[in-house]
């Protein structure tokens, strides 16, 4: 289990992980690592939340929110933001399904992708600032948001098909079963409930689950399945929806 956690931490983040900690784990077994996604999200959110808390007293709420969002993006290497941009470039191109998938492969940033990045990053900064001004616990909110967003991404993997013939997303999409999905969602719910008591966290998670489920169905109808890019988009949008639900 520990090897699986370190392998997933190295796979979906840019945090330094010694290779020997995950050595011996076959790539084809990575799908079992979905249950570690909420824990990894918890770690990322906690680090981002600590940055917010430290900077808030020094430079104020807006700049603290800006740098916490920046740190979160740096820790993931912009991996999920890139997926969001590619997904929006493809889906909003109004082309055929094959053309959409080809556009999503293009490394160049399009208008729709650029707008999506600006909107999501700016929205996160504004929502975090508003939560802090309302007296909500910033560290707990960020940690829960990151845990829940990565946990609910399982909804785009379970009983979905991979829209392409190859790619990194193929490790998870269509490869996880109902038990793994329930465990992943259960862990995310526990983290949300513990970090944000009084049912606020659980209620926000329910809203996020509904939003991500609907997103998954829309993407399935549009693209014929999911890709690594759509998983990244789901994680980014999941974070934002969860934080919005806390307002």
From Swiss-Prot:
Pathway: Cofactor biosynthesis; adenosylcobalamin biosynthesis; adenosylcobalamin from cob(II)yrinate a,c-diamide: step 7/7. One of its GO terms (cellular component) is plasma membrane. InterPro entries: CobS. GO terms for molecular function: adenosylcobinamide-GDP ribazoletransferase activity; cobalamin 5'-phosphate synthase activity. Joins adenosylcobinamide-GDP and alpha-ribazole to generate adenosylcobalamin (Ado-cobalamin). Also synthesizes adenosylcobalamin 5'-phosphate from adenosylcobinamide-GDP and alpha-ribazole 5'-phosphate. Its EC number is 2.7.8.26. Belongs to the CobS family. It is found in: Cell inner membrane. It comes from Escherichia coli (strain ATCC 8739 / DSM 1576 / NBRC 3972 / NCIMB 8545 / WDCM 00012 / Crooks). Keywords: Cell inner membrane, Cell membrane, Cobalamin biosynthesis, Magnesium, Membrane, Transferase, Transmembrane, Transmembrane helix. Its cofactor is Mg(2+). The chain crosses the membrane at residues 34-54, 59-79, 113-133, 194-214. It catalyses: alpha-ribazole + adenosylcob(III)inamide-GDP = adenosylcob(III)alamin + GMP + H(+); alpha-ribazole 5'-phosphate + adenosylcob(III)inamide-GDP = adenosylcob(III)alamin 5'-phosphate + GMP + H(+). Its main location: membrane. It is a multi-pass membrane protein. This is Adenosylcobinamide-GDP ribazoletransferase. Signal peptide: none annotated. GO terms for biological process: cobalamin biosynthetic process.
């Amino acid at each position: 289990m520990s090897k699986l956690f370190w392998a997933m931490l190295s796979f979906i983040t840019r945090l330094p992980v010694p290779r020997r900690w995950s050595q011996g784990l076959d790539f084809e077994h990575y799908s079992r690592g979905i249950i570690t996604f909420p824990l990894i999200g918890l770690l990322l959110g906690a680090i981002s939340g600590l940055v917010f808390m430290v900077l808030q007293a020094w430079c104020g709420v807006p700049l603290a929110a800006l740098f916490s969002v920046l740190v979160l993006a740096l820790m993931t290497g912009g991996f999920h933001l890139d997926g969001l941009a590619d997904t929006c470039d493809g889906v909003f191109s109004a082309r055929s399904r094959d053309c959409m998938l080809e556009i999503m492969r293009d490394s160049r940033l399009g208008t729709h992708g650029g707008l999506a990045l600006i909107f999501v990053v700016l929205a996160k900064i504004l929502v975090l600032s508003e939560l802090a001004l309302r007296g909500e616990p910033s560290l707990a909110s960020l940690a829960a948001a990151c845990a829940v967003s990565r946990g609910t991404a399982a909804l785009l993997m379970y009983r979905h098909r991979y829209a392409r013939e190859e790619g990194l997303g193929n490790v998870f999409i269509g490869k996880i079963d109902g038990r793994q999905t329930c465990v992943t969602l259960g862990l995310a719910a526990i983290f949300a409930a513990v970090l944000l008591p009084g049912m606020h966290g659980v209620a926000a998670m329910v809203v996020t689950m509904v939003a991500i489920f609907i997103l998954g169905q829309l993407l399935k109808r549009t693209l014929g399945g999911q890709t690594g890019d759509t998983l990244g988009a789901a994680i980014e949008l999941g974070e934002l929806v969860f934080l919005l639900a806390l307002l």
